Amino acid sequence: MSQLCPCGSAVEYSLCCHPYVSGEKVAPDPEHLMRSRYCAFVMQDADYLIKTWHPSCGAAALRAELIAGFAHTEWLGLTVFEHCWQDADNIGFVSFVARFIEGGKTGAIIERSRFLKENGQWYYIDGTRPQFGRNDPCPCGSGKKIKKCCGQ
């Protein structure tokens, strides 16, 4: 039975993010890494999240926190609304909205993630969360104000 990839690509999981999460392939760019990391959150795969965090970030120390978070979070969807990178610079950025339910309340992570390429592999470094006013347009592209969309 085939299942669509949780990353929102509308492609079957086995043909989309599974090869990266399973370790069969290395994500070719920051957008694929971002999408596969989202899948790892959905599928509660702390090993993949830690493996794809840059080693300088000390992600292994976050394992217990990641696993505890899995128990309380249901991921609802991912929208990638901007991505840019240059292989020559070995740095890339992906902006996204990840929607979830936690403790019975809906929420969203709106982030511009930073990625670094080392030895042919992209790694997540960190992310910044832009500040939006409640009446600003939602960055997901819905056309709604943030207070009526991802900022609820």
From Swiss-Prot:
InterPro entries noted in UniProt? NTF2-like_dom_sf, SEC_C_motif, UPF0225, YchJ-like_M
**Origin superkingdom:** Bacteria
Pfam families assigned to the protein according to its UniProt record, in alphabetical order: SEC-C, YchJ_M-like
* Sequence similarity: Belongs to the UPF0225 family.
The family database entries (PANTHER family) matched by this protein are listed as: ADENYLATE CYCLASE-ASSOCIATED CAP C-TERMINAL DOMAIN-CONTAINING PROTEIN, UPF0225 PROTEIN SCO1677
How is this protein named in the record?
UPF0225 protein YchJ
Q: Which organism is it from?
A: Shigella dysenteriae serotype 1 (strain Sd197)
